[in-house]
A protein has these predicted regions:
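Hydrophobic ligand-binding cavity/cleft-lining segments
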Residues: 1-46
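Short beta-edge strand/loop motif at the mouth of beta-sheet-based domains
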Residues: 14-15, 34-71
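Hydrophobic/aromatic beta-strand elements that line small-molecule binding cavities or substrate pockets
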Residues: 17, 49-52, 74-80, 104-113
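A short, structured loop/turn motif at beta-sheet edges
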Residues: 23-24, 53-55, 79-86, 110-119
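Hydrophobic pocket/interface hotspot
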Residues: 26, 36, 60, 78, ...
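Helix-adjacent hinge/juxtasegments
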Residues: 59-90
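Short, solvent-exposed aromatic-acidic interface loops
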Residues: 92-96, 123-130
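A conserved amphipathic terminal alpha-helix motif
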Residues: 127-158
Length: 158
């Protein structure tokens, strides 16, 4: 199943790019802490900490830092992991399946090979229309787009 086959949901925000990079390199950048730190936050923000256990039920913690030093942690769990093809994660739970105070989204990232290229799709499914609108107003397309550029640049060097 490709990302295009997934049913659209009214509360989805989606970014899709056809990249001249093999899927395995993109997947590494999404799963290896040292690589995540190099691309996951839109510049001038940075990633100060990554702690992840990439398996279904495994935890994820990524802390982004503003240029002024403000830290913004994002934690959750992986729901589905298909190496080099698909990652599904949510912030509805934290480590140990503890319910989060305020769930915001579920991320579905796919890496679909197309010849020598990869169709990269980041789909963010929100719990409700208000959360979707808030994320879009925060700059989803600009921020995730910039991060995708940073991801592609890093993956091309691997």
């Amino acid at each position: 199943m490709t990302a295009q086959d997934l049913p659209e949901h009214a509360n989805d925000l989606v970014l899709t790019r056809l990249l001249d990079i093999p899927a395995d390199r993109l997947y590494r950048c999404w799963t290896e802490p040292a690589l995540i730190q190099q691309w996951f936050a839109p510049s001038p923000w940075s990633v100060s900490r990554v702690d992840n256990d990439v398996r279904p039920g495994g935890h994820s913690l990524i802390v982004m830092r503003s240029p002024e030093g403000q830290e913004m942690p994002g934690s959750g769990v992986y729901l589905e992991v298909i190496p080099t093809r698909r990652l599904v994660f949510t912030d509805a739970f934290t480590q140990g399946w503890v319910p989060a105070d305020k769930p915001f989204m579920t991320g579905i990232v796919t890496f679909d090979p197309e010849g020598s290229q990869t169709r990269y799709t980041a789909r963010v499914r929100h719990w409700n229309a208000a959360d979707r609108a808030q994320h879009e107003a925060m700059g989803f397309h600009t921020g995730w787009g910039q991060c995708t550029d940073q991801l592609a640049e890093l993956a091309a060097r691997l």
